[in-house]
Design a protein with these regions (language model features):
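Hydrophobic core segments within long, regular secondary-structure runs in both alpha-
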Residues: 6-9, 13-16, 26-40, 122, ...
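Active-site acid/base region of carbohydrate-active enzymes
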Residues: 18-117, 135-181, 293-294
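Structural signature of alpha-solenoid helical repeat junctions
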Residues: 4-10, 20, 24, 117-120, ...
Length: 389
């Protein structure tokens, strides 16, 4: 799938941020460049897998599996755009598992220039520019940096409905799917003037995606600080929820689809159903590295009205342990232990005007930013924080 090839850059970057080790980036550097698929671009930078640009050289450069040759039953197989799974198949016969199912793409209108694919492409270019700079390939750095800017401009010029401010599924389409809007939100593509419109649209759509798509949906929601809606969706008990798996289907393992009615032949052990594991750690408790190898960690809890929460989080520098007591809009307290050789940047929810923060009983300076108060350069060791007015 085209999507998976582009996601390799995201995986490589996450590995670097969590370990601080450049050896993998260095070893696979040329492979990573090819997996941006920048050679499939037209003049405006947007890429397509359907316009005859996918050559054998490109397939070989990204190491297309031999399995795909037999799977596609073609002499010259090509990439296929996923968006989400399963897809609707109007040509499926009655014996096929795809017969009669709606699919999980939110009626995505597949076009040559695909908004989902080009959103991934944009992010792959951004990451490749960072990797090039880290490794000292400055010509590549400027190429990928400039190409990313071009692609972002083209997406916003050619793939937005002017009146609604929403993204269409692809060039020539009039349909706006959930997927075509949550990926631009996740990757920071959306113009500021359209942000509220896109977020409102996403909230109206609910869980109109598979467990695979849910990962990206939650990333987008928490990146845009939509913690109330994010928690509502995460704890839903409808037929598109993790609670449905546990309480209704009796699952003890993450599944491929929300229910058999959405994919009759779903398997019972699919890793892509495990989004809550990282969403809770990285977004609700808010632990993310902002300097490679956790030299600096951001702690940005977005727990909304959860009363209490605890987490132990292993990093390459040691374990971060934290616990929170929360009375939404009234009280917030955090105990945290930061490992040696790590510095923290901690975000606290803004519950009051003229709010202040105490660390170990002493008032400390902070920076206010929209819905948060931020304290930087917190060193290692056990700390207690309270907000007050």
């Amino acid at each position: 799938w085209t999507d998976y090839i582009l996601q390799v850059l995201i995986i490589a970057w996450e590995d670097y941020m969590h370990t601080g080790d450049v050896s993998s980036l260095n070893y696979f550097y040329n492979d990573l460049k090819e997996k941006t698929l920048h050679k499939l671009a037209r003049k405006d930078g947007l890429i397509s897998t359907k316009t005859g640009l996918v050559t054998k050289e490109i397939l070989n450069a990204v190491h297309l599996s031999e399995i795909e040759y037999s799977r596609q039953k073609k002499e010259n197989p090509t990439f296929r755009d996923l968006v989400d799974w399963p897809q609707k198949n109007l040509n499926a016969n009655k014996e096929s598992w795809q017969y009669g199912i709606k699919g999980e793409t939110d009626d995505f209108d597949f076009r040559n220039i695909n908004t989902v694919i080009n959103s991934y492409h944009y992010q792959s270019l951004v990451i490749m520019s960072k990797i090039s700079k880290i490794l000292g390939y400055l010509d590549d750095y400027y190429f990928f940096k400039n190409r990313a800017s071009k692609v972002k401009n083209s997406i916003n010029k050619k793939l937005i409905k002017p009146k609604s401010g929403l993204y269409i599924d692809g060039e020539g389409s009039i349909h706006s799917s959930l997927h075509a809007n949550f990926l631009p939100l996740k990757f920071g593509i959306i113009p500021k003037k359209n942000l509220e419109k896109v977020i409102a649209f996403i909230k109206k759509k609910g869980m109109s995606c598979s467990p695979y798509g849910a990962q990206h949906l939650f990333d987008a929601l928490y990146k845009s600080e939509q913690s109330e809606y994010g928690l509502k969706l995460l704890t839903s008990k409808g037929d598109r929820s993790w609670a449905h798996w546990i309480y209704d289907l009796g699952a003890t393992m993450t599944l491929e689809a929300w229910d058999f009615k959405f994919k009759p032949n779903m398997d019972w052990n699919h890793a892509w159903g495990s989004a809550p594991g990282n969403i809770i750690a990285n977004h609700i408790m808010g632990i993310q590295p902002i300097k490679p190898g956790f030299e600096i960690v951001r702690i940005k809890p977005q727990i909304f009205d959860i009363k209490s929460a605890k987490l132990n989080y292993s990093t390459i520098r040691g374990e971060i342990s934290m616990s929170i007591i929360n009375d939404y809009k009234n009280f917030f307290s955090m105990d945290i232990n930061i490992p040696s050789n790590m510095e923290a940047e901690i975000y606290f929810p803004k519950y009051f005007n003229d709010q202040k923060i105490k660390m170990n009983g002493k008032t400390i300076d902070h920076v206010e930013k929209e819905n948060f108060l931020i304290v930087k350069k917190i060193g290692s060791g056990q700390k207690n924080f309270n907000i007050f007015r």
